[in-house]
Amino acid sequence: MDRRSFLCTAALSALATATTSPLLFGQSISQRQPIFGRRRAQRGKNQQKIPIAVQLYSVHRLAASDLAGTLDEIAKMGYDGVEFAGYYGNDPKDIRKMLDNSGLKCAGTHTDLRDLEDDRFDRTAEIHNILGGKLMIAPIVPYSIENALHDVDTNKRLAERFNVMAEKAKPYGLFVGTHGGEGRLVDGIPASERFFNDTVPEVVMQIDIAYFMSTGGDPYKMIEKYKGRSKTIHLKESGRGGPIIGSGNVDWDRIFSLCETVGGTEWYVAEDEGSADDFGRIAACIKALRAMGK
């Protein structure tokens, strides 16, 4: 089951059972050695240290069976936070206690788009304030829904929906955004560029580096062009066989330099969907990132 189906199934289940309970959302390591450090000596003094989280969907079966234990293990690996994709039936207040006990922060969530609109928005925002995470990211590739990839007007209407959500988020001190990135064209312009051209600066651009590159997108160009909008970015390696971060095709020095100078990045979020019931791959991810000086 992919993350979109996972979140949608979780959302429908939660809505079916919700009465007085809180709303519940939505929801072989490569032998090649990491490549890093080619331009580290050239980094400017204005670059900042950015905390690293992991997207919990990477180990969602472990999180579903023991969320507190999973958070503790993630903290021991050296991660600074986690990004949620569903709450596994737990009350947000209890999750906040788990986070505090483990020493982790909430880097944000992947939240079903339906929970960011209409009468669900306020409850969604309240839960994020409980968790201490201010980034509410729609985990789908929104440019492709409702045939937006092939329709300029639909793409624009989708952007308008996010502008409304961004305005509603302001009183809560929160931000909404989209996950993924789409390099395919809408009337001659990459869908993601068209979308972010039509949205206000407060709409966050969470690029999934590997996915975006797979659609022909240029993540380096996007971070540079939409300055300050990459408050969060998914660090996922591109290449055959699902390589660990640092052993594929991504120019990580360039990504980090852009994020730390013009991207406005507040969280790096590692994601590796190679094994949902094993800590090995996300442990390898944080090890590689720390070796890169992150």
Regions picked out by a protein language model, each given a short descriptive name:
Residues 79, 104, 174, 264, ...:
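Short phosphate-binding/catalytic loops that engage adenosine nucleotides
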Residues 89-98:
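Active-site-adjacent beta->alpha loops and helix N-cap segments on the catalytic face
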Residues 4-28, 32-53, 60-71, 75, ...:
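Histidine-acidic metal/acid-base catalytic patches
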Residues 11, 16-19, 42-44, 81, ...:
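Active-site acidic/histidine proton-transfer and metal-coordination neighborhood
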Residues 53-65, 110-117, 148-152:
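Active-site mouth loops of central-metabolism enzymes
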Residues 53-57, 83-85, 107-112, 137-139, ...:
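A cross-family glycoside hydrolase active-site/sugar-binding cleft signature
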